Each structure stands twice: as structure tokens, then as C-alpha cells.
């Protein structure tokens, strides 16, 4: 699988897509993400780990909590990973 396809595959999962969407509002505590994306804590942790490994989000510990932030280049990287026709708005 190409790097572009792998990046899109990470973002395409419904839970991870919801997390990315929530993080477009800005830095968010994991406790708030749990409220916005109602999945079990271990499932949330797994999906956040995959997004971190893909470089789409960053994490910073604040006491016993972790704050998550959308990576500065995340949206640009996702846009660049799209097929050219999708980026240009062309229709088949």
C-alpha cells in the first residue's frame, strides 16, 4: 500500500474521522474527546495511537490528562493524498 493510500486509510475509519473532525476545533482534552466520540476508553486510545503514528495529531500530557491537537500539516497532507481528480474537484 502506498504512503498516500495508508494515510487515507487511517483517516477513513469512522471513529478516527470523527476524532479528526473534533480536533479541527482546536486542542482538546482526551476527556472531551470521550464525550464527543462515544466509544470505550480502550478503543479511543487505540484510534488516537494510530492517528499519532500517522502524524495526523499530536499529544501533550497535562497532569493526568492528555491534550490532543491536529497536526499543523494534517489537512494539507490528507488533501495531497487524494487522487488528483478529487483535489481538483473534477467529476468522472
Please annotate each region the language model reported.
Residues 21, 45-49, 64:
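Base-recognition residues in the alpha-helical recognition helix of bacterial helix-turn-helix
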Residues 1-3, 21-24, 72-92:
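Amphipathic alpha-helical dimerization/coiled-coil segments
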Residues 53-62, 69:
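Beta-hairpin "wing" of winged helix-turn-helix
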Residues 29, 40-43:
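Helix-turn-helix DNA-binding motif, specifically the short coil turn and the N-cap/start of the second
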Residues 6, 17-19:
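Pre-recognition alpha-helix immediately N-terminal to the DNA-recognition helix
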Amino acid at each position: 500500500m502506498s504512503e498516500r493510500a495508508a494515510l487515507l486509510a487511517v483517516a477513513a475509519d469512522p471513529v478516527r474521522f470523527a476524532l479528526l473532525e473534533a480536533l479541527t476545533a482546536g486542542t482538546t482534552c482526551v476527556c472531551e474527546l470521550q464525550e464527543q466520540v462515544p466509544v470505550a476508553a480502550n478503543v479511543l486510545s487505540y484510534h488516537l495511537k494510530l492517528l499519532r503514528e500517522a502524524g495526523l495529531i499530536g499529544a501533550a500530557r497535562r497532569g493526568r490528562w492528555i491534550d490532543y491537537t491536529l497536526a499543523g500539516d494534517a489537512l494539507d497532507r490528507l488533501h495531497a493524498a487524494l487522487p488528483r481528480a478529487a483535489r481538483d474537484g473534477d467529476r468522472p
